[in-house]
A protein has these predicted regions:
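Short, Gly/Pro- and small/polar-rich lid/capping loops
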Residues: 1-14
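Aromatic- and carboxylate-enriched substrate-binding clefts and catalytic-loop regions
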Residues: 95, 103, 228-244
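Catalytic and substrate-binding clefts that recognize carbohydrates or anionic sugar/phosphate headgroups
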Residues: 64-199, 206-207, 212-213, 219-224
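A low-complexity, Ser/Thr/Gly/Pro-enriched, surface-exposed linker/loop concept
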Residues: 4-5, 29-68
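Structural preference for beta-strand elements that scaffold enzyme active sites
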Residues: 199-201, 231
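Ser/Thr/Asn(+Pro)-rich, low-complexity disordered segments
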Residues: 18, 224-225
Length: 244
């Protein structure tokens, strides 16, 4: 793949932010952003994925407490309790600190997420309201993004499917600090690319059966008439249209 099409990534988290057992790995990316991985084979993913480009967050404070039942992890924002076994509703929970809600700021693994919604991939065939993917902010103070099925980005710019059966989750526990949640989301996933300047100028697009010669003549005519166009679109005739 050409170099200009490759995506810059820094997928390795600081080793000091990792709490790991034989079959699990918990990465404290920030005080409110926790990565949760579980693999029966003890194999974890350090490469970038379609979701996560940058896991190299700066060091943050956390505390690990070992108990008879497993481990507890405390940060300024969340309190995680885990029995160090396969993820389950009884064995993995995270409480968002700060008295966000009396009953709803505690998440157990497997519970349905009630957030404020994210985005939709396309508006094709939409007619009215459409379902949205999960977002990263919630009135309950937390949300969860499941990265278990994302494609992996390779160093040469191509992608490949992930190994099946590995759980890879990102827990966002920011309470009502929505701005900070979105800030860390954008760091993890990469900034949204800005539109190139030329795309903000005038466009010419017409569904018309041009030839190469007639299209070039049209561009020259625009130039002669001092009509400023920064983008010229061939419309549908860049591919076959008469296929019957």
């Amino acid at each position: 793949m050409q170099e200009r099409y490759r995506v810059q990534t820094r997928p390795m988290a600081l080793s000091s932010q990792i709490v790991q057992g034989d079959k699990y790995r918990i990465t404290i990316l920030t005080e409110g952003l926790i990565r949760l991985e579980y693999s029966e084979e003890g194999v974890f993913e350090d490469r970038a994925t379609k979701l996560a480009f940058f896991r190299d967050f700066p060091k943050c404070d956390y505390r690990v407490v070992h108990t008879e039942d497993g481990i507890e992890i405390h940060t300024s924002r969340v309190h995680l309790i885990y029995n160090e076994k396969e993820f389950s509703s009884n064995g993995l929970s995270i409480q968002v600190k700060g008295n966000i809600s009396v009953y709803h700021s505690l998440w157990h693994y497997g519970e349905e997420i009630h957030d404020l919604g994210g985005t939709a991939r396309t508006l094709d065939e939409a007619d009215g309201a459409i379902p949205l993917d999960h977002g990263v902010v919630s009135g309950f103070g937390y949300s969860l993004l499941d990265d278990s099925e994302s494609q992996v980005l390779l160093e040469d710019g191509w992608i490949e499917p992930r190994k099946k059966g590995i759980k890879d989750l990102y827990f966002f526990g920011y309470g009502h600090d929505y701005k900070e949640a979105l800030k860390d989301f954008y760091y993890l996933c990469g900034q949204t690319p800005m539109l190139p300047r030329y795309a903000l100028g005038n466009w010419w697009s017409r569904y018309y059966k041009y030839t190469e010669e007639s299209y070039m003549e049209l561009m020259e005519r625009f130039d002669q008439e001092n009509l400023p166009f920064t983008v010229a679109v061939i419309d549908m005739d860049w591919h076959l249209v008469d296929i019957d």
